[in-house]
């Protein structure tokens, strides 16, 4: 069976579980379960600490896992990114107290930086020729400055609310942009059929989240103009109607552009425009 690691907690956990459920995989029913076998789909799910997933995958103990790109980079393991998953987006930033004179990357020289991602931060500073002390903390790094442990912090920033509440402000360019991703062991062949099935299923979920199915009627004389507005994934499906002057069109369109596309179609003569959500897909 394909061994898959998923986060047991944290901001990536629930979206990861939901994605796997939408892809047809069985999840745990008891929060104390650490391992779930799904023989019908040929997988075994392991619920692990987010920080540890890349380590297990990199060492080959787990075949694939869902983690953050920042966690993968910080792990320094041999695990390989296989595909981005479109959730858990964040930036990794430096932050200093509002009243601090630290405002540029160069100002970090000789300072103390508290972070959970010590390897990522150390490598970034070395790359930019900055010498600083990196202090590893397992969480709540915002408190380190107030407690006198560090001069500044480096941490994942989603909305910035936590930093502002702690009297901190971000500065300098982001160390990196991150999102959730599927990673694989270097021991697992990229062409492995089990990995291919998982990849198709997850990509199908992503497509269903990003696209909708649009149906509309259009005069035959306006079909070319309508197809120019909604070209579809490959090509729209065009069918004749009882009224021989009209055709029915079915096409996939980006969910984010639905209302604008409906307006544009109406302008070129389309009527009976209907949008249907997708539950799953294989492209």
Swiss-Prot record:
Family according to the record: Belongs to the ATP phosphoribosyltransferase family. Long subfamily.
Required cofactor(s): Mg(2+)
EC number: 2.4.2.17
Task performed by this protein: Catalyzes the condensation of ATP and 5-phosphoribose 1-diphosphate to form N'-(5'-phosphoribosyl)-ATP (PR-ATP). Has a crucial role in the pathway because the rate of histidine biosynthesis seems to be controlled primarily by regulation of HisG enzymatic activity.
Ways its activity is controlled: Feedback inhibited by histidine.
Single GO molecular function: ATP binding
Keywords: Amino-acid biosynthesis, ATP-binding, Cytoplasm, Glycosyltransferase, Histidine biosynthesis, Magnesium, Metal-binding, Nucleotide-binding, Transferase
Primary residence: cytoplasm
Gene Ontology BP, a term: L-histidine biosynthetic process
Pfam annotation, one family: HisG_C
Name this polypeptide is given: ATP phosphoribosyltransferase
Pathway: Amino-acid biosynthesis; L-histidine biosynthesis; L-histidine from 5-phospho-alpha-D-ribose 1-diphosphate: step 1/9
Top EC category: transferase
Record InterPro entries: ATP-PRT_HisG_long, ATP_PRibTrfase_cat, ATP_PRibTrfase_CS, ATP_PRibTrfase_HisG, HisG_C, N-reg_PII-like_a/b, N-reg_PII/ATP_PRibTrfase_C
Subcellular location: Cytoplasm
PROSITE patterns: ATP_P_PHORIBOSYLTR
HAMAP family referenced in this protein's UniProt entry, alphabetically: HisG_Long
Domain of life of the organism encoding this protein: Bacteria
GO-annotated cellular components: cytoplasm
Protein's organism: Bifidobacterium longum (strain NCC 2705)
Catalytic activity: 1-(5-phospho-beta-D-ribosyl)-ATP + diphosphate = 5-phospho-alpha-D-ribose 1-diphosphate + ATP
């Amino acid at each position: 069976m394909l061994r898959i690691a998923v986060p047991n907690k944290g901001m990536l956990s629930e979206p990861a579980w939901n994605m796997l459920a939408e892809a047809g995989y069985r999840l745990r029913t008891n929060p104390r379960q650490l391992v779930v076998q799904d023989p019908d789909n040929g997988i075994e799910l392991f619920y692990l600490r987010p920080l540890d997933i890349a380590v297990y995958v990199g060492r080959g103990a787990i075949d694939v896992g869902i983690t953050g790109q920042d966690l993968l980079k910080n792990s320094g393991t041999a695990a390989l990114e296989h595909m981005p998953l479109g959730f858990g987006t964040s930036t990794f930033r430096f932050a200093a107290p509002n009243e601090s004179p630290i405002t540029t990357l160069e100002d970090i020289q000789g300072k103390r930086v508290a972070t959970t991602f010590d390897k990522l931060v150390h490598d970034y500073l070395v790359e930019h020729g900055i010498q600083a002390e990196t202090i590893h903390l397992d969480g709540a790094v915002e408190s380190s400055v107030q407690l006198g442990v560090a001069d500044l912090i480096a941490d994942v920033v989603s909305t910035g609310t936590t930093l502002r509440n702690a009297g901190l402000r971000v500065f300098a360019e982001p160390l990196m942009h991150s999102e959730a991703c599927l990673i694989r062991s270097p021991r697992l062949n990229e062409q492995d059929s089990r990995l291919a099935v998982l990849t198709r299923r997850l990509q199908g979920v992503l497509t269903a989240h990003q696209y909708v199915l649009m149906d509309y009627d259009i005069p035959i004389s306006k079909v070319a103009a309508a197809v120019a507005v909604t070209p579809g994934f490959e090509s729209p499906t065009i069918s004749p109607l009882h009224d021989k002057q009209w055709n029915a069109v079915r096409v996939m369109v980006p969910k984010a552009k639905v209302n604008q596309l409906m307006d544009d179609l109406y302008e070129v003569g389309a009527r009976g425009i209907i949008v249907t959500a997708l539950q799953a897909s294989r492209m």
